[in-house]
Amino acid sequence: MTGLRWATQFCPSAKYILKCDLDTFINLPLLTRFLPIIKGKVRQFMIGHGHEKQLPPVLREGKWAVSDHLYPFDYFPPYLIGHSYAMTSDIVKHLLSVSDFIPLIPAEDAFITGVLARIIRVPRLHFDGFAHDNHVCLPCNIVYNEDITMTKMSLSRLLLLWRQISMDDCLAEELPLIRNQFSNDSVAIGDIFWYSRK
């Protein structure tokens, strides 16, 4: 929530807000072409990789544990995986105002893109090009604009990947090379689907 407050204070003219983990690479050239295309179809939205389960279970033990006094339900609303997701900036003030009345849940992605997003009724859109744990993303997928984000990367790999994007070239050993599916600034809306409208 602090990051969203910071963004509204220091980036008031931003059209989009991106949340990403420190070990996540963002293909900014592709993302900056991609988001306006979506906004042309959907005025307000969150987009990322939807949780694999339509009713994501609330974990009561482990790293992502949420106590039942904070969140007494067995399932979260559908939410976007927290490695990386983007949203139109005009929904942030609504998220912040609602968050003042809801106990903060330590699972940030479930809280912001699940609980709060459901309350303000913002569409959450799933796109496979955003990182998630079960997706094998090769560096060439980023370089040749198949994927927008890649996660669990070391600093040296992040720098190497940026150099490869800048040169529009990929290391030969990093197989499947499919050229730039977004180069004409269009995206098949069929590749993106409503994760949850509720």
Feature-to-residue mapping (PLM):
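Secretory-pathway lumenal glyco-enzymes, predominantly type II signal-anchor Golgi glycosyltransferases
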Residues: 1-198
